[in-house]
From Swiss-Prot:
Residues 189-200, 269-279 have a biased composition (Basic and acidic residues). It holds the Pfam family UQ_con. Belongs to the ubiquitin-conjugating enzyme family. InterPro entries: Ub_conjugating_enzyme, UBQ-conjugat_E2_core, UBQ-conjugating_AS, UBQ-conjugating_enzyme/RWD. Catalyzes the covalent attachment of ubiquitin to other proteins. Capable, in vitro, to ubiquitinate histone H2A. It comes from Saccharomyces cerevisiae (strain ATCC 204508 / S288c). It is found in: Cytoplasm; Nucleus. Residues 7-169 form the UBC core domain. It comes from the Eukaryota. It catalyses: S-ubiquitinyl-[E1 ubiquitin-activating enzyme]-L-cysteine + [E2 ubiquitin-conjugating enzyme]-L-cysteine = [E1 ubiquitin-activating enzyme]-L-cysteine + S-ubiquitinyl-[E2 ubiquitin-conjugating enzyme]-L-cysteine. It is an enzyme of class 2 (transferase). Pathway: Protein modification; protein ubiquitination. This is Ubiquitin-conjugating enzyme E2-34 kDa. One of its GO terms (biological process) is G2/M transition of mitotic cell cycle.
Length: 295
């Protein structure tokens, strides 16, 4: 295997895994390999999930073939069987600028709209779904379909509805057609920043404790109690601040349910008071003796 083919194979394998990963896959496409030993030929089911589209509900089979120098050359895309669409040839080949090689003298398409190595399989498939819903009638591949689309829209819609119903027989056994709601949820998960997911699980995110730029804990003004720098806690929690020598400073909360640990030992208090009581009694005796002598 040549180095270029090996590069293409590795790239396609990675993109195939991403597009078939349940967590990352786009609901509009069902993708399988024609042969498990050949990464260069993909069988694809194209679905339009927009409920307002006349193509909604269809499962349009297609095949994608990749050249050995991919991504430097574009893949080929063909609907199998062909569908009635202004930009689909009667043999099923798709006429779309993103799959045309740049610099082709047979077309007048600007290079910005043609194939480039930065394109991916995903970007191509998304462009195809967009073209299904919004045909380019200025460059038709099927003239009859283009005329119907422009001059006989109702006739065109009826023809497409027939295509949609016919395509349903190609839905793989056991495959559940996605809905527009599932597509929205899937896209929302992809768009959700990882920081937001982590933030939802972060205890301190909704706390009154903030971090400064150095990661140290800062106490807000309303955290202090009458100027004593004491943070009140409920349920007699004990607030300990450990000023360790290392860079990690921790705040520890200890729930002490044993009253003996938090309460004052009455016996020890009485013991501390006993000397004062003895001194008071001694002074009283001396006063009595002095009075007796005077009498």
């Amino acid at each position: 295997m040549s180095s270029r083919k090996s590069t293409a194979s590795s790239l396609l394998l990675r993109q195939y895994r991403e597009l078939t990963d349940p967590k990352k896959a786009i609901p509009s496409f069902h993708i399988e390999l024609e042969d498990d030993s050949n990464i260069f030929t993909w069988n694809i089911g194209v679905m339009v999930l927009n409920e307002d589209s006349i193509y909604h509900g269809g499962f349009f089979k297609a095949q994608m073939r990749f050249p050995e120098d991919f991504p430097f050359s574009p893949p080929q895309f063909r609907f199998t069987p062909a569908i009635y669409h202004p930009n689909v040839y009667r043999d099923g080949r798709l006429c779309i600028s993103i799959l045309h090689q740049s610099g082709d003298p047979m077309t007048d398409e600007p290079d910005a709209e043609t194939w480039s190595p930065v394109q991916t399989v995903e970007s191509v498939l998304i462009s195809i779904v967009s073209l299904l819903e919004d045909p380019n009638i200025n460059s038709p591949a099927n003239v009859d379909a283009a005329v119907d689309y422009r001059k006989n829209p109702e006739q065109y819609k009826q023809r497409v509805k027939m295509e949609v119903e016919r395509s349903k027989q190609d839905i793989p056994k056991g495959f559940i057609m996605p809905t527009s709601e599932s597509a929205y949820i899937s896209q929302s998960k992809l768009d959700e920043p990882e920081s937001n997911k982590d933030m939802a699980d972060n205890f301190w995110y909704d706390s009154d404790l903030d971090d400064d730029e150095n990661g140290s804990v800062i106490l807000q003004d309303d955290d202090y109690d009458d100027g004593n720098n004491h943070i009140p806690f409920e349920d007699d929690d004990v607030y300990n601040y450990n000023d360790n020598d290392d860079d990690d400073e921790r705040i520890e909360f200890e729930d002490d349910d044993d009253d003996d640990d938090d309460s004052i030992d009455n016996d020890s208090v009485m013991d501390r008071k006993q000397p004062h009581k003895a001194e008071d009694e001694s002074e009283d005796v001396e006063d009595v003796e002095r009075v007796s002598k005077k009498i």
